[in-house]
Design a protein with these regions (language model features):
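Acidic ATP/Mg2+-coordinating residue in the GHKL
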Residues: 82
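Bergerat-fold GHKL ATPase/HATPase_c domain
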Residues: 1-67, 71, 90-94
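GHKL/Histidine-kinase-like ATPase module
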Residues: 217-252
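A short glycine-centered beta->alpha linker in the GHKL/HATPase_c
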Residues: 86-88
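Conserved beta-strand core positions
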Residues: 46-48, 76, 123
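GHKL-type ATPase core
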Residues: 103-218, 222-230
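Short beta-strand element(s) in the Bergerat
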Residues: 73-78, 165
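Mobile ATP-lid/nucleotide-binding loop of the nucleotide-binding subdomain
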Residues: 97-99
Length: 252
């Protein structure tokens, strides 16, 4: 009989301070980068789009000149889209298994998806991928109640369709939501800082960060606008010194 994990109990064991409110988003973006590492397509075709979604309710205020201006509002949902391998049988089975060893060589502990539910109400996943020479679509919700529906994979009766996986983090909880700055540029900087080891390899996919108010950043281009400093990384396993970008300039 397989061992099952109580999702609510597992999430309850996780400690996540409000200062680390963006870690669930970081986990999602890193998952997308790693998925693209494993797929055999040209780097120029690899792409990740991060949608930072604000509340649809528009708030306004009066500025010093008496003009009515729109105020920025909190991010309430995030959506990360990539064209990587997707939730095929192997990756989906790993998702269902706590402390999975599938990506242990990449430094993954196998509990990141539980981190999602510490800061968000639920996660919706929609993945279109190719397996056994057939196109499949897998769609499900992940919440404290587990995965629903359990039967969530279907074969698509088509010859070709875009490979795409969308992970939607829905319902940003407090105190995490209020701990994140409103500014999209600030979010861009934090994503670059967290994912810096991937950016300095030269093989990072195109990563676009955008909100639903018309602002956007190409993170691969943005990181070149940082001042240079020396960062020491230990690589396989000899220490190497690499020049990277860390202190911020304005991101335009």
């Amino acid at each position: 009989m397989p061992i099952t994990v109580n999702v609510a109990g597992q999430v309850g064991q996780i400690r996540l301070s409000s200062s680390k409110a963006l870690w669930p988003l970081f986990e999602t973006v890193v998952n997308s980068i790693q998925s693209l590492e494993d797929i055999d397509i040209p780097v120029v075709e690899k792409k990740i789009v991060i949608d930072a979604l604000r509340s649809e309710e528009v708030q306004t205020r009066q500025d010093a000149q008496g003009n009515i201006v729109e105020e920025q509002s909190h991010f309430v949902d995030f959506r990360v889209t990539d064209n990587g391998n997707g939730f095929d049988k192997s990756n989906y089975q790993s998702f269902l298994e706590a402390y999975s060893q599938l990506k242990v060589k990449k430094g993954c502990k196998g509990i990141g998806r539980f981190l999602w539910l510490k800061a968000f109400d639920k996660v919706t996943i929609n993945s279109t991928y190719i397996e056994d020479k057939k196109w499949h679509q897998r769609s499900f919700d992940f919440s404290l109640d587990g995965v629903k529906p359990e039967q969530n994979d279907k074969v698509l009766d088509i010859k070709e369709t875009p490979r795409q996986t969308i992970v939607s983090l829905r319902g940003f909880k407090n105190p995490y939501r209020d701990a994140v700055a409103y500014n999209l540029e600030s979010l861009a900087k934090k994503l670059i800082e967290h994912c810096l080891p991937y950016f300095i390899t030269g093989a990072c996919p195109k990563i676009i960060l955008q909100d639903n108010r018309g602002d956007s950043f190409n993170l691969v281009n943005c990181k070149t606008k940082f001042h240079s400093q020396i960062l020491k990384l230990e690589v396989n396993p000899s220490p190497k010194t690499l020049e990277v970008n860390s202190s911020e300039k304005g991101l335009q």
